[in-house]
Regions:
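Cleaved targeting-peptide boundary
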Residues: 25-31
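Extracellular adhesion/carbohydrate-binding repeat motifs centered on closely spaced tryptophans
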Residues: 35, 39-42, 88-90
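Secretory targeting and sorting signals
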Residues: 1-24
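Extracytoplasmic/secretory-pathway segments with low complexity and glycosylation-like composition
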Residues: 31, 47, 54-59, 63-80, ...
């Protein structure tokens, strides 16, 4: 009996691994494959935030024009000080390309919408955030902790069903880019989502999307 149980568990683990690998293989450009109609922004090497083709073209143009929009002799922000009428684009904290204010607003909006523009946000790799759930007959409470985030950034949490990511809540990273201790993200209700659900994390300071584990809070109501 014990040998049969061990064999069954091994078979199940193998099937799960095969399923996971197949899911990754199904995405033509890896875990950050964009949904139809979107492409990578490419504001810097490794920038895989999904945007419209027009915004990627605009981003490339901003790179070309960036040097001409800096104060030639520097200023209060050093050599990256922008001329009057321009601001840093800030697709991430170190992005000091000088652009019109509308372009910075666009970059912030694109970061905030990064999850919904991925083909499968639940296929993204594990990041520095972990989650845990305290369960109850009516659902449960989702808590998160972690590091490696943008300092002072808004950190958003989603559940990843097969159709559309559902927003669960948000936290704010501290000055070191961490979520100290176990902080409550949301109170979740049974029968209100996929079960179990993959939790997706968005670092809004960079638009980076990762996963943080799963929750059983959406279990069938008792």
């Amino acid at each position: 009996m014990l040998a049969w149980l061990i064999a069954a568990v091994a078979l199940l683990a193998g099937l799960m691994a095969t399923s996971s690998s197949a899911m990754a293989t199904d995405l033509p450009y890896g875990p950050y494959t964009c949904a139809a109609g979107y492409v990578w922004r490419d504001a810097y090497a490794g920038d895989q935030v999904c945007v419209t083709p027009a915004i990627r073209t605009q981003t490339a143009t901003e790179h070309a024009l960036g040097p001409s929009r800096r104060e030639p002799n520097g200023g209060i922000y050093g050599p990256d000080t922008c001329r009057q009428g321009f601001v840093w684009r800030a697709t991430r904290p170190s992005d000091h390309v000088c652009v019109p204010p509308d372009s910075r607003d666009q970059a912030s909006s694109d970061n905030a919408n990064a999850v919904s523009r991925l083909a499968d946000p639940g296929a993204t790799p594990r990041g520095g955030v972990s989650v845990t759930t305290t369960s109850s007959p009516t659902g449960g409470r989702l808590f998160a902790t972690g590091s490696g985030l943008t300092p002072y950034s808004t950190v958003r949490f989603y559940s990843a069903p097969t159709t559309w990511p559902v927003s669960l809540g948000r936290l704010t990273a501290d000055a070191a880019g961490t979520l100290q201790g176990w902080q409550q993200v949301a109170a979740l209700h049974c029968d209100s989502g996929p079960y179990p659900a993959t939790i997706v994390v968005l670092d809004q300071g960079t638009g980076l999307v990762t996963t943080a584990g799963t929750t059983d809070a959406f279990h069938p109501c008792s």
